[in-house]
Amino acid sequence: MENSYTVDGHRLQYSVPLSSMHETSQNSETYGLSKESPLVCMPLFETNTTSFDISSLFSFNPKPEPENTHRVMDDSIAAVVGENVLFGDKNKVSDHLTKEGGVKRGRKMPQKTGGFMGVRKRPWGRWSAEIRDRIGRCRHWLGTFDTAEEAARAYDAAARRLRGTKAKTNFVIPPLFPKEIAQAQEDNRMRQKQKKKKKKKVSVRKCVKVTSVAQLFDDANFINSSSIKGNVISSIDNLEKMGLELDLSLGLLSRK
């Protein structure tokens, strides 16, 4: 039997008699329901109503909060390019080196390395040094030392030997010779080279080949001749001293 009726389009419910309350209490005890359990009053709906959201009854703020559109946009961009690129890496340490007392300070090193490259602290308190060879793909053991600074200097020496002047070192290593001494040595080398050039003399051949009469009488005092090594100037007096005579047939005859 239906306990409701309609008035002016509104659906109303009949009052429940006291006898029915007794039956309701018995039914609640039968199904194990507590009398002190709270009751939820459900409203009546029209027949054309298909669904009802029960969460709206318990929501304290029925109006949903508007989302931050800027944050959603930033998150979507960060998913594509990466958070480190968009927001920056907060834990990143600047790679700029600051020199303090001749020591290069770069990125933060853990305490077990003593703040130096290629240095590690052993469990018994000493410091070990080793360097990686990129060409051979191996590690070179440099030994153990009493202090971290000694181990770091051993690493620097090995790095300079393996990688030359472009090696990254813990300490600022000066050149082998000061600039003044190196410049003086370079000047001495240049002077020695110039002296050697001055000492070089052109070797003159004693035998001269004459090819024409004009070559003989072009100059009264000198004979211009051409040799394999270059132009050679010879004097007529030198020919007389050597005991040679000139012949019109352009040959050289020795005196008898």
Swiss-Prot record:
<dbReference type="GO" id="GO:0003700">
    <property type="term" value="F:DNA-binding transcription factor activity"/>
</dbReference>
<dbReference type="InterPro" id="IPR036955">
    <property type="entry name" value="AP2/ERF_dom_sf"/>
</dbReference>
<comment type="similarity">
    <text>Belongs to the AP2/ERF transcription factor family. ERF subfamily.</text>
</comment>
<feature type="DNA-binding region" description="AP2/ERF">
    <location>
        <begin position="115"/>
        <end position="172"/>
    </location>
</feature>
<keyword id="KW-0804">Transcription</keyword>
<dbReference type="GO" id="GO:0005634">
    <property type="term" value="C:nucleus"/>
</dbReference>
<keyword id="KW-0539">Nucleus</keyword>
<protein>
    <recommendedName>
        <fullName>Ethylene-responsive transcription factor ERF084</fullName>
    </recommendedName>
</protein>
<dbReference type="GO" id="GO:0003677">
    <property type="term" value="F:DNA binding"/>
</dbReference>
<keyword id="KW-0936">Ethylene signaling pathway</keyword>
<dbReference type="Pfam" id="PF00847">
    <property type="entry name" value="AP2"/>
</dbReference>
<keyword id="KW-0010">Activator</keyword>
<dbReference type="InterPro" id="IPR001471">
    <property type="entry name" value="AP2/ERF_dom"/>
</dbReference>
<dbReference type="InterPro" id="IPR016177">
    <property type="entry name" value="DNA-bd_dom_sf"/>
</dbReference>
<keyword id="KW-0238">DNA-binding</keyword>
<comment type="function">
    <text>Probably acts as a transcriptional activator. Binds to the GCC-box pathogenesis-related promoter element. May be involved in the regulation of gene expression by stress factors and by components of stress signal transduction pathways.</text>
</comment>
<keyword id="KW-0805">Transcription regulation</keyword>
<dbReference type="GO" id="GO:0009873">
    <property type="term" value="P:ethylene-activated signaling pathway"/>
</dbReference>
